[in-house]
Amino acid sequence: MTPEEFRQSLAGQGLNLTDEQMQQFELYYEFLVETNKNLNLTAITEKNEVYLKHFYDSLLLALTVKDLQTEELSLCDVGAGAGFPSLPVKIAFPQLKITIVDSLNKRIKFLQELTQKLNLQDVHFHHARAEEFGGKRSVHRERYDLVTARAVARMSVLSELCLPLAKVGGRFIALKAQKSDEELKNAQKAIEVLGGKVIADYATELPQVHDERHIIVVAKEKETPKKYPRKAGTPAKSPIE
């Protein structure tokens, strides 16, 4: 997907990017690939692939969950890595207030430099484990309208890391490359225990390559019990299932 195809495909979905926004995506690509020579941020570095499998893939979130396009929402991106999905969404919809949490300080430094280069406002960074960031004494607990994760971890694990950060009435949104009904079924207990309820499971695909994508939306209906999330590493080792 060339940058022009990226722009046209989004325009076909009602998302019209300005020349300035296209320039921001170009700078993002250049800085990502340059930094990736010394810091392992992504295995995808070919330009057309980055535009499709990182930038467009991230924007599927806003094309699916449409209030992201117009509302001034607070969004916490857990384990953002090289900034996906939150920073492409921020470029397209600058009114969003973004908080990024990542456990690797080198990635946080890359993202801080990147947002300065792109002149993005209202983006905050935290070098932390998600289990600590959403812990019972954390000021970030139950604070965000939306919490996102674009990760391979199981839904039961992601739910324990992300749901404590969503405010009651907010949502946790998981972006999954593949989704098995069994994985979602196994996560039901965790989602319920943590105060959530699955309200949507959108099946979509990347254009051109037709790779399957799932966007799973979990509503935060009640407060997460204080004992969750458990200490760092425990959710992955022994998920609530």
Curated annotation (Swiss-Prot):
GO MF term list: rRNA (guanine-N7-)-methyltransferase activity
Pfam families xrefs: GidB (PF02527)
Binding site for S-adenosyl-L-methionine: 79, 84, 130-131, 150
Entry protein name: Ribosomal RNA small subunit methyltransferase G
NCBIfam families: rsmG_gidB (TIGR00138)
Signal sequence residues: none
Function recorded in the entry: Specifically methylates the N7 position of a guanine in 16S rRNA.
This protein's UniProt keywords: Cytoplasm, Methyltransferase, rRNA processing, S-adenosyl-L-methionine, Transferase
GO cellular component, one term: cytosol
Family: Belongs to the methyltransferase superfamily. RNA methyltransferase RsmG family.
Compartments, record wording: Cytoplasm
Domain of life of the organism encoding this protein: Bacteria
Cited Gene3D superfamilies: Vaccinia Virus protein VP39
EC number in record: 2.1.1.-
